[in-house]
Amino acid sequence: MKPVIPALLAAVLPWALCLSATAHEIPAPAIVHNARDGVVRLYGAGGPDTAFRKVATAYQKNTGVQVVITAGPEPTWTKNAQANADILWGTAEQDITAFLETYKTFSSRDVMPIYIRPAIIAVQKGNPKGIRGFDDLLKNGMKIVVTEGSGVANTSGTGVWEDVAGRLGSLDDVKRFRTNIVAFGKGSGASYKAFVSMHADAWITWPDWPITHPEQADLVPLSKARTIWRDVNVVLAPDADPEARKFVGLLTSEEGARIMKTEGWVR
């Protein structure tokens, strides 16, 4: 007779490894979603939240309805979102698609792309290396940070650096760019920390990061030929508080657009 424990391990281990390598959280069957608590609750990755908070301030001033925005790495808020989220936001289409694998209350049919922004180059304050565009990043000795989910984190930055580097169909561009990468951050927050702590020369990211961290970074645009665009989107729960839809109405209004544009979000 074969030993039972090794046989069980052989059967279970591959499955367990697959779970540990997932780029999204696992649904908790014991959690029952109920968003009707009189508070508009939004959850999503860091980045858009700073602009969303400005819109929320205007909404609360006009209506008196509380809006609670929770942002950051998904593991820090997933259980609460499974319980009471009115709105999820995705920082890219692939980002929200991954979220919907966990938050089964929400439907892909209800996802609304609301704004879009371009990939840019963040450089150290004052741009000490004089970076003016993508070609400067191919120079020997450049230190570049990129954002990459690496199969274990859900982030809008996944693949962006490769899309930018390979935009013109040049394998040599990809090779030379990759040689200069000093950190792959599993999320924009992690990338920002690496950019600061390593005093990297450049970081391929989104406009909102240097805009909201002017003491640390400056923004250098990519050329039109190199620019990659990704959207921010929202999806409402079927049982969302009625005020949640009204908040989205303000978010997507002309007033909302003016606020969002202050951090690089356009449409």
Predicted regions and their residues:
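Bacterial N-terminal signal peptides
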Residues: 7-18
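N-terminal segment of the mature folded domain
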Residues: 24-146
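Ligand-binding cleft/hinge of the Venus flytrap
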Residues: 56-61, 134-185
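Short helix-initiation/N-cap motifs at beta->coil->alpha
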Residues: 70-79, 172-193
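Periplasmic-binding protein-like
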Residues: 116-118, 147-149, 214-248, 251-267
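Short helix-loop capping/hinge motifs at secondary-structure junctions, enriched
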Residues: 125-132, 151-153, 239-245
